[in-house]
Amino acid sequence: MKITKNILKAEFIKRPNRFQAYVKINEKIEMVHVPNTGRCKEILIPGSTVILREENNENRKTRYDLIAGYKGDMLISIDSQIPNKVVYEALMNFKIEILKEYANIKREKTFGKSRFDFKLEKENGEVYYLEVKGVTLENDGLTMFPDAPTERGTKHILELIDVKNKGMGAGVLFLIQLNGVKKFTPNHKMDKNFGEALRLAKEKGVDILAYDCLVEESSISLNNPVSIEI
C-alpha cells in the first residue's frame, strides 16, 4: 500500500510517553504523535533517523505521525494501524495462500463477546475469523511478539481457540513490519502467558501465520511467509 501523504525524515530525540515523541526537523525540535503503544526501544534511539507522515489536521496538537524508524540500514514500520491495512490488501488480492478461497472479507466483526480483525467467508458459507498482530521487535533476524505485556493479546488467542472449538476456522497472523527476517517466535520472557496461549492455540488447530513486509519510506506491502517456532 502507498502512503499518499507527505513523508519526511527527522532525527529522533526522545519519547516522554507512549503517544508523544520529540524529533529534530531542519534543526527545529518538534513534538510528534507516536501511533504505537509498544515500547519500540530498539528502534526509537536518540540520534536515529525516523520517518514522519504529515497529517495537516488543524484539530490535532501535532502536525506529524512518527510511522517508521531506521535500525541501522533496516527500515521498520511502527504504525499500529498499518498491519490491518496491509493484510486487508493482501486478502483482497489473494496473496495469503491458505486463505485464498475466502472471497467475502469483512473487517472488525464480533463473535460472542469478542471482536476480531477479519471475518472471512467462502461461497459455501464456511466462516473463518482472523486476528492480526503487528511485529516490530527484531534481533539478528529473529522477530518476536509482544514487546510489552499484552493481556488483550492473550485474550484474543484464547478466544480464537473458542472459535475453533465451535467448528469454525480461526487464525492469527503476525505481520512483521520489516523485511529480510529469518524466524518468528513468541516473546516468552516478556509475556509468558501469551506464549503459552499461542502454544495451546496451535495444539487446538488454530492457524499460526507469520509474514514479513517490503517496507519503503512511502509504501509497505505483504512479502513472504516466515518460519515460526513456538
Curated annotation (Swiss-Prot):
Quote the Pfam families the UniProt record gives.
SfsA, SfsA_N
A Gene Ontology molecular function term of the record: DNA binding
The family this protein is said to belong to: Belongs to the SfsA family.
Name under which the protein is recorded: Sugar fermentation stimulation protein homolog
